[in-house]
Amino acid sequence: MSVNYYNQNAQAFFAATKDVDVSSLMSRFTPNLPAQAHILDAGCGSGRDSKAFLAMGFAVTSFDASHELAAVAANYIGQPVQVCTFTEFTHAQSFDGIWACASLLHVPASQLPHTFAHLASLLKPQGLFYCSFKYGAHDEVRDGRAFTHCDEERLQRFIAHSGLVLRETWKTTDLRPGRENEYWLNALLIKE
């Protein structure tokens, strides 16, 4: 459902999100990574964050389930973007960090424990995992997209058997203009 939306609206989504300033979120993530870390941008969307990480000198591998968004992102960042879902993605090497900004929220709640465990298997020991969800404890379908909202308690349930431990959570307002009344749960997780 959500993939079809992004395939049909890739250019509009790219235009609406590529200039959103998420540096305040990245500033909680990047200082905790080794120099020249390899980051997985999981569900990279427009490629905005991949491009920023590359500009910071990090190695970045990106994927998205939407083939149209992946093509737009690949053009934007100047390197390939793999087309696959979270649980389809595999890689020969482990990552220092995983960045899943506003992407895991499209995974049904029933599949998130397995999805977190799969992604955790791609991290190096003590690897860092950032994720963000619309804040709440419910699921909804809106504008042709499925959303899994998440609060602190729900996140703990999703990661309980994943090999990840919670380092910190914080709430923010939506960074896109006109959405200041929407709240997000941000989390930093560590692989045990």
Task: Give residue ranges: language-model regions.
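Conserved class I S-adenosyl-L-methionine
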Residues: 1-34, 36-45
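Conserved beta-strand signature within the Rossmann-like core of class I S-adenosyl-L-methionine
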Residues: 126-133
